[in-house]
Amino acid sequence: MASTSCFLHQSTARLAASARPAPAVGRTQLFVCKAQKNDEAASDAAVVTSRRAALSLLAGAAAIAVKVSPAAAAYGEAANVFGKAKKNTDFVAYSGEGFKLMIPAKWNPSKEREFPGQVLRYEDNFDATSNLSVIINPTTKKTITDYGSPEEFLSQVGFLLGQQSYGGKTDSEGGFESDAVATANVLESSAPVVDGKQYYSITVLTRTADGDEGGKHQLITATVADGKLYVCKAQRDKRWFKGAKKFVENAAGSFSVA
């Protein structure tokens, strides 16, 4: 618009020349006007460029500073699509008769009673093979160590692993002994002390010759308190998929007796 104003000023000057003498606008003045406008346009362009560069720099810095969390989720977990912090809703606290533990939030209570003294049973609503039970029975023992070693204790509560009902002659495939259709192997055991109370923690792999040679992991946590034997038994399939393992192991590891 400044250049246009300059040309209009030149035309007005020519019309007024016949009426009164006036200094004509020279080429130098017109050139200066154009140059001044060009300088202003260049200045405006530079400002716009500087602003764009600043915004780009800020956006780049923000992208570097923010750590984006992946949206992928394991089995049983909710995807954190927008990267917002969320509370841990994977487990629910449960308090029973003298005991407490964390139960996977998506597990359902079960009315099935497998063992004498069973007071609680929950199972995975996707695969019932993953489940946990709490068993409470009276005992004359003062502490869990009165049962002997963890392996000796396990031999006295063999009902937790199931009893072989078949008594005939057989030679099953899969590494079973003659006339045996089930086997149990202790994978690891420990005797942790939690809040001054002695516990036994035992992991057992059980296998049967009924097409389940792959086996199941049995996680057993036990202690004695107030004349009672408290046992938490959690089970999972040996060949499980991503994510299921943590629910069973964390639930078994959270078991404690008051």
From Swiss-Prot:
Induction: By light. Its main location: plastid. One of its GO terms (molecular function) is calcium ion binding. Gene3D superfamilies: Mog1/PsbP, alpha/beta/alpha sandwich (3.40.1000.10). Residues 1-73 form a transit peptide. Keywords: Chloroplast, Membrane, Photosynthesis, Photosystem II, Plastid, Thylakoid, Transit peptide. Signal peptide: none annotated. GO terms for cellular component: chloroplast thylakoid membrane; extrinsic component of membrane; photosystem II oxygen evolving complex. Pfam families: PsbP. One of its GO terms (biological process) is photosynthesis. It is found in: Plastid, Chloroplast thylakoid membrane. Belongs to the PsbP family. May be involved in the regulation of photosystem II. This is Oxygen-evolving enhancer protein 2, chloroplastic. It comes from Triticum aestivum (Wheat). The lineage of its organism: Eukaryota, Viridiplantae, Streptophyta, Embryophyta, Tracheophyta. The gene is PSBP.
